[in-house]
Swiss-Prot record:
Protein name according to UniProt: Flagellar assembly factor FliW
GO-annotated biological processes: bacterial-type flagellum assembly; regulation of translation
Family: Belongs to the FliW family.
Gene name of the record: fliW
Keyword annotations from UniProtKB, A to Z: Bacterial flagellum biogenesis, Chaperone, Cytoplasm, Translation regulation
Length: 147
């Protein structure tokens, strides 16, 4: 099926690519169907786009590429909601606040978006140790691994 996106125009997606966020995203609790679209193969960035609303789309970054010591635990409750069975099925992204220049942009390390790629489920979680990682972390030149 074709969907209109906020940043990439019209794209073709398959039903099996749709991610379900049972509780939506923070502030968008009613928005539950998203798709993850690549932006540039050379950058650890993607577009998390609502399937239903063109105006709801977020640039997301692979946070470990920008902060190599970024780490957190996923609670048992979140693991159950996401139906996580194997660690290799899990991907984490951070929502990007885009500014005029890439260097002025920030990523939200406080509330990562966790995806279970195998089960096509997602959830944005708020880290309990909220002093460890900021809401607006500067997007420095890549310091970690993008893989």
């Amino acid at each position: 099926m074709k969907i209109a996106t906020k940043f990439l125009g019209e794209v073709e997606i398959a039903n099996q690519d749709i991610l379900t966020f049972e509780h939506g995203l923070l502030g968008l609790e009613e928005e539950r169907k998203f798709v993850l679209l690549p932006i540039d193969a050379d950058l650890p960035l993607a577009l998390l786009q609502s399937v239903q609303h063109v105006e709801i789309g977020f640039v997301v970054a692979y946070p470990f590429a920008f902060k190599k010591d970024y780490s957190f635990d996923i609670s048992e409750e979140d693991r159950e909601q996401l139906q996580i069975e194997k660690q290799e099925d899990v991907l984490a992204y951070a929502i990007v606040t885009m500014k005029e220049t890439f260097q002025d942009s920030t990523i939200n390390l406080l509330a990562p978006v966790i995806l279970n790629i195998a089960k096509k489920r997602g959830k944005q979680i708020v880290l309990q140790d909220n002093k460890a990682f900021p809401l607006r972390y500067p997007m420095q030149p890549l310091e970690g691994s993008a893989k």
